[in-house]
């Protein structure tokens, strides 16, 4: 398949993601009793900026990169969301993910709307200096629409605390004063928060703990399969192993490892490279598709979207599915899993730990007072447990599935703020 065809396929997939997000938002607002005008406001971002960023490469040439920043709804407060560096970034994906950030912030009851950014690039082929120049160029290009009270970026796919540090420094230079609250996910010495690196995995862990209670399963010795061994997947494997659960399957882009008696998680974590790859060290590797259908109690898709579909949903043997990735389960597959009695914890709830601790970082920056790792963990647990219970009860009260209940919970805050402002 050609690179051009891959690009077209990615654009089509992103459009489907955007349209499916709109479909569920429409139903959520209808269930909550809002008029059609509210959906017209919420179905698209308020603001979508496309920028062109010229970067001098190490060989002396100048390459122009395309970047995006989407701000979905700022009725509640500033928008918030990550910046991803990836060759498959496109406008529809960024728009959809900014809507998801509105939902995540609403679920966690944070004073934010949703934002998202991205640059079409392959950071794996770029030098340290090229990445720095690209990061600073992006901030210069979007500087008029971002800031601590406007829109607060954060790390995402292939971006990290170093890139956040460059971006914070560039923004501070432009404003001529230090502005750590402009961005989150920074190094600790530049105003980062304890617990930020593990926040997403901690949030998923808490959701698993709450889900097993609902299903009457003991976490100790529960059999868990984790698809994806990046930041969230690897930390989750560690947390589950430490909690006494039996991690029987993990995977990366190369394939999966499966052992019904349990994998040696400390060994795999030690051998994992910076891109989350470890299965290339083994010969007995199965496909990601095969791994998803293995017998287990808890399945955690923590890799990419559209992994559980109508084609394989009937073969999923887990009684609990917790979505640590964005959009790993299609709408059709969600219906099948619900009909089969599988408890599905949706992505916008399960992965809300990251933005929650980003909010804590922003609060600490504004106060100039910093919390211990234990304080951050305690506050995160309080938010995640409350969010899980609210969505679980919403699903029971309205007789809807957990995904629709999560959308209802997530969109309500921005919808109410928009109504009070007189926008609808």
From Swiss-Prot:
Residues that coordinate or bind NAD(+): 200, 231
The enzyme's E.C. designation: 1.4.1.2
pH dependence of function: Optimum pH is 7.7 and 7.3 for L-glutamate deamination and 2-oxoglutarate amination, respectively. Half-maximal activity for deamination is observed at pH 6.9 and 7.8 and that for amination is at pH 6.9 and 7.8.
One term of GO molecular function: glutamate dehydrogenase (NAD+) activity
InterPro entries: Aminoacid_DH-like_N_sf, Glu/Leu/Phe/Val/Trp_DH, Glu/Leu/Phe/Val/Trp_DH_C, Glu/Leu/Phe/Val/Trp_DH_dimer, Glu/Leu/Phe/Val_DH_AS, Glu_DH, NAD(P)-bd_dom_sf, NAD_bind_Glu_DH
Keyword tags: NAD, Oxidoreductase
Effects seen without this gene: Cells lacking this gene lose the ability to utilize proline, ornithine, or arginine as sole carbon source and grow more slowly when proline or ornithine is utilized as sole nitrogen source in the presence of glucose. A double rocG-gudB disruption has the same phenotype as a single rocG disruption.
Catalytic residues, chain numbering: 116 (proton donor)
Temperature dependence per UniProt: Low thermostability at 41 degrees Celsius due to the dissociation of the hexamer.
Positions contributing to substrate binding: 80, 104, 358
EC category: oxidoreductase
Swiss-Prot/TrEMBL catalytic activity: L-glutamate + NAD(+) + H2O = 2-oxoglutarate + NH4(+) + NADH + H(+)
Family: Belongs to the Glu/Leu/Phe/Val dehydrogenases family.
Known partners and oligomeric status: Homohexamer. Interacts with transcriptional regulator GltC.
Record function comment: Devoted to catabolic function of glutamate (and other amino acids of the glutamate family) utilization as sole nitrogen source. It is not involved in anabolic function of glutamate biosynthesis since B.subtilis possesses only one route of glutamate biosynthesis from ammonia, catalyzed by glutamate synthase. Wild-type cells are unable to utilize glutamate or glutamine as a sole carbon source; thus RocG does not function physiologically to synthesize glutamate, but it is involved in the utilization of arginine, and proline as carbon or nitrogen source.
Family annotation (PANTHER family): GLUTAMATE DEHYDROGENASE, GLUTAMATE DEHYDROGENASE 1, MITOCHONDRIAL
Name of the protein: Catabolic NAD-specific glutamate dehydrogenase RocG
């Amino acid at each position: 398949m050609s690179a051009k065809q891959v690009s077209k396929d990615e654009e089509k997939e992103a459009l489907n993601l955007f349209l499916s997000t709109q479909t569920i938002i429409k139903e959520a607002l209808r269930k909550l009793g809002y008029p059609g005008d509210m959906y017209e406001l919420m179905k698209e971002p308020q603001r979508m900026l496309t920028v062109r960023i010229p970067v001098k490469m190490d060989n002396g040439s100048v390459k122009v990169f395309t970047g995006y920043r989407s701000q979905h709804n700022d009725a509640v407060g500033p928008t918030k969301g990550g910046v991803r560096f990836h060759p498959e970034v496109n406008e529809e994906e960024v728009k959809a993910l900014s809507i998801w950030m509105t939902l995540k912030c609403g679920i966690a009851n944070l004073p934010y709307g949703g934002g998202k950014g991205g640059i079409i690039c392959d950071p794996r082929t770029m030098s340290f200096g090229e990445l720095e120049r690209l990061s600073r160029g992006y901030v210069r290009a979007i500087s008029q629409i971002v800031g601590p009270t406007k829109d607060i970026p954060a790390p995402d796919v292939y971006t990290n605390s170093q890139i956040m540090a460059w971006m914070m420094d560039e923004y501070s230079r432009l404003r001529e004063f230090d502005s750590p609250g402009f961005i989150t996910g920074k190094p600790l010495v530049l105003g980062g928060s304890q617990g930020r690196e593990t926040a997403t995995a901690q949030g998923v862990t808490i959701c698993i703990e709450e889900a097993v209670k609902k299903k009457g399963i003991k976490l100790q010795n529960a059999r868990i399969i984790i698809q994806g061994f990046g930041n969230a997947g690897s930390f989750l494997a560690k947390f589950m192993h430490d909690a006494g659960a039996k991690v029987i399957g993990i995977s990366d882009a190369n394939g999966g490892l499966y052992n019904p008696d349990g994998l040696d998680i400390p060994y795999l974590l030690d051998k994992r490279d910076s891109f989350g790859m470890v299965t290339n060290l083994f010969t007995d590797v199965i496909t990601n598709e095969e791994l998803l259908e293995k017998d287990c109690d808890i399945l955690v898709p923590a890799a990419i979207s559209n992994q559980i579909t109508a084609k394989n949903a009937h073969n999923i043997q887990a009684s609990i599915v917790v979505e640590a990735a964005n959009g790993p389960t299609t709408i059709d597959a969600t219906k099948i899993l619900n009909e089969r009695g599988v408890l599905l914890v949706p992505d916008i709830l399960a992965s809300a730990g990251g933005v929650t601790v980003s909010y804590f970082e922003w609060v600490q920056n504004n106060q100039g007072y910093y919390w211990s790792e234990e304080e951050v963990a305690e506050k995160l647990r309080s938010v995640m447990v409350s969010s899980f219970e609210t969505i679980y009860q919403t699903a029971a009260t309205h007789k809807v599935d957990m995904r629709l209940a999560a959308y209802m919970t997530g969109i309500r805050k921005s919808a109410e703020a928009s109504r009070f402002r007189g926008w609808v």
